[in-house]
Amino acid sequence: MNQDQRDKLARVLIDEAYTCSERGDTDDARTLLRQSVAVRFRDEIEKIIKGDVKLLNIFTDMQHDKDVDRRVMARALIHVLIEDKRFLEKYKPKFEIVEDQEETKWLNQEINL
């Protein structure tokens, strides 16, 4: 699958995430959002898993960006990484999962626009 195809699939997944959020299914919405990020940023995720600490730092810093979309995307990407066994083997001592309500707020804001 090339990048253009991945971008289209990621867009479909994010649209479905909004649909799930509209009907109040936040767990599915959150899962679809993370799948969308995993598809769209597949190459970046693989680079991070292989040890690209500079790229990892970019995404960890982006979690505190002023732009809500960038912040939520970065947090979703970090969650995707944390769920990957290869990533955990390399970085587990440095990362842990923290419950995040911002993804749900972000999905709800996008729907209300």
Predicted feature residues:
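Short amphipathic alpha-helical heptad-repeat segments
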Residues: 2-14, 45-55
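Charge-dense (acidic/basic), low-complexity helical/coil segments
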Residues: 95-98, 105-106
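Short acidic DE-rich linear segments
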Residues: 106-113
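Acidic, low-complexity, intrinsically disordered interaction modules
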Residues: 24-27, 36-95
